[in-house]
């Protein structure tokens, strides 16, 4: 990634279904200039998927927002705020408690994103599963699973 392509983007999880792009932006506006705010919605239903992204113009603004907003309440729900993972491939194996076959927080598969592959601490015995398993947060959904505890697969020898 070239220096000009650097994005200072936060992942915001645990959003209320009612949270809009505007209310997400308003909640983070005091931390610096916001270039973009987006609540991710289901393509078919148009309903919020419970997470979104906020992109800042500077790294300091992003870091302040992460430090001050993580665990805070927005629209009646406690939110999780982290630095967003790159859109590129996952981190390859391991990660946050990742067991067999990749897994972990953004590890394993090229469709990457949060929990791509085995999911958030998932063991990956037959696919899917875990916190965002399969497509995962920010993943391209090149296969089953996806979402909170996304399904798919079973025990496999």
Swiss-Prot record:
Residues 82-157 are annotated as: Disordered. Induction: By the plant hormone abscisic acid in response to water stress. Pfam families: RRM_1. Keywords: RNA-binding, Stress response. It comes from the Eukaryota. Residues 8-86 form the RRM domain. Residues 87-157 have a biased composition (Gly residues). GO terms for molecular function: mRNA binding. InterPro entries: Nucleotide-bd_a/b_plait_sf, RBD_domain_sf, RRM2_NsCP33-like, RRM_dom, SLIRP/GR-RBP-like. Disulfide bonds: none annotated. CDD domains: RRM2_NsCP33_like. Possibly has a role in RNA transcription or processing during stress. This is Glycine-rich RNA-binding, abscisic acid-inducible protein. It comes from Zea mays. The gene is RAB15.
